Design a protein with these regions (language model features):
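Conserved short "hinge" loops at termini or chain/domain junctions
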Residues: 1-77, 135-151
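Ordered, amphipathic secondary-structure segments that act as subunit-interaction surfaces
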Residues: 61, 77-101
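Functionally constrained cores in energy, signaling, and assembly domains
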Residues: 54, 83-85, 122-124
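Short loop/turn elements at secondary-structure junctions
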Residues: 2-6, 11-12, 90-151
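Alpha-helix boundary/N-cap detector
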Residues: 39-42, 46, 79, 83, ...
Length: 151
C-alpha cells in the first residue's frame, strides 16, 4: 500500500492499494461483504491491509516486497494477488459466518499459509523480484548445512 498527500487528494491522505475492495468480488459476493462489514468500507480496507502485511511478511526475507506490492493491474503477480485475496476473505469471515462455508475458507487459508511458509523457507520459488543492494546486485543470503550424521 502506498500513501500520497497532495492537492489531488484535497490535502488528505489518499490510499492507493495493491488490492481494492471491488476486486474481492472474484472471491466473495459483494452483498456478503456488505453484510459482514455492515457497510463499513474501513473494515474491508483494514482486512486488505492486514492481508497484504501478512503475505508480505512471508516474502520479505528474500523478495523485494516494495516492488511486488507497488505493482498495479496486470503487472501484479497473479499468485501473490490470489493469495492476498484469500487471506483478505479469511480476515473478513472471521468476523461473521454469513452465507459462507467456514471450512472451505479455513482450508484455503491454511493452504495459502503452507505455500507462503514454503516460499519463506526457500522450498518454493515464485517468479518475484529478488532483493537487491545499492549496486543493483541480487542479495542472496548464504545458507550452509550438512546431511544428517550416521551413527
Amino acid at each position: 500500500m502506498r500513501w500520497t498527500v497532495g492537492p489531488a487528494a484535497g490535502g488528505k491522505i489518499n490510499r492507493t492499494m495493491y488490492l481494492t475492495p471491488e476486486e474481492l468480488k472474484s472471491h466473495m459476493y459483494a452483498h456478503i461483504v456488505e453484510e459482514i462489514t455492515e457497510g463499513d468500507e474501513q473494515i474491508v480496507l483494514q482486512a486488505i491491509e492486514a492481508a497484504v502485511e501478512e503475505v508480505r511478511s512471508y516474502l520479505r526475507p528474500r523478495y523485494d516486497t516494495d516492488r511486488i506490492f507497488a505493482a498495479e493491474g496486470s503487472e501484479r503477480n497473479a499468485l501473490v494477488l490470489e493469495n492476498t485475496k484469500i487471506v483478505t476473505v479469511w480476515n473478513l469471515i472471521k468476523l461473521s459466518n454469513v452465507e459462507t462455508i467456514y471450512e472451505i475458507w479455513k482450508e484455503r487459508y491454511d493452504r495459502v499459509i503452507k505455500y507462503l511458509e514454503g516460499v519463506a523457507a526457500g522450498t518454493r520459488t515464485p517468479s518475484l523480484p529478488l532483493l537487491t543492494d545499492e549496486k543493483g546486485e541480487v542479495r542472496i543470503k548464504m545458507r550452509c548445512g550438512s546431511n544428517p550424521k550416521f551413527r
